[in-house]
Amino acid sequence: MSYALFDINQPLDFTAHPEAGYDLIVAVNVLHDASHVVQTLRRLKLLLKAGGRLLIVEATERNSVFQLASVGFIEGLSGYRDFRRRDEKPMLTRSAWQEVLVQAGFANELAWPAQESSPLRQHLLVARSPGVNRPDKKAVSRYLQQRFGTG
């Protein structure tokens, strides 16, 4: 397992983050800070292997006073330069997250809770990068032989 920090608003650095180098990317309460959500999601998709997953946890209540009071002062909620400028609301609803994931080329796999409005005021979403990640049969065979010997 390997992990690394990633600045969502900077161009990709393939020396630090290999293209198609990750099976899973976890983004918890960070993607709403993207200056352009769809572009950021497209960059993340480039980092995922075929069939890789993007796991997102995000606040999904667009008018949450608590969210604006607690997070707004810390992170700032005005750096966006995409469709959110129209209504000056940085947070996305569950369905809006699912829409931007599709726009970025992902397939939606899971949204929990399933209902749009959640008493948690946030959702967990899982999206899949296109394609199928096929294992290298020779590498698997070598590993099994090294691990368990020949039988």
Predicted region positions:
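4′-phosphopantetheine-dependent carrier domains
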Residues: 1-151
